[in-house]
């Protein structure tokens, strides 16, 4: 009965960019299962909607709901959903149980699916599976038969002629993309939204040293980052003047960043959404991990490499525990040397 054209499905994806990328294979399977259905998604930021525009799956509508803009916008969206009359709601696996129940009650689909019905969410699964696989668990009852879990695929538009010429002029021994940021922050005091902690950051000093080693090897570097990473640029002032460095921090949209990754031999960074994007575009990635588990949170695909070792900290990965935010030394990341990262990049691009 689910194949009828009037079936309306809403998928809740109110999370970050990396989580959105990980949802793409499930959305693809959902469209294959229900080719005539109306499939809508709701995301938290416009950048997430931009990512889905490049996904290899047809979606009918992508709504942006800024959950931080107040109760009014949430009420307005819920009212719109009730007017649409969704038959099916699907919850992202890492939305908490209580938030899922509130959200589904607000939008009021005929029925909804998600692992939250079992009283769990991704953060309580203790490293059982990858984000990508968790999305399939969320829709398991709906998809019914066994589905082969595949990697996310993003298809960005082509570079402009000017950008192409700029990158080609820099290519000596290839281009390596460097995501200079420390990833999103968490709060020490979550309810008060106070005490920002960059739990996954490797440090801009390490990034600067890595960039220098790459340049000294004849490798050109393109720097990736958003508005938040612009604050780190003063720490890189001595390398920004090099003709081997292309600084795109704060200068590109998500779609443009995707285009640029296509010209890279490799993209390196910490556990960020950009690493998921690069892998989904088909580019080899080298990701630096510490408090999160690369095999559950990392880029999904056979070209993804991870720098991670539990010997650096016996409590790693600590994501989901109090230590994730309250740790004071971050030795799981600090003990990863620039040379170690550089050597793995060299192996990948050669």
Description of each model-found segment:
Residues 1-350:
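Catalytic machinery of carbohydrate-active enzymes
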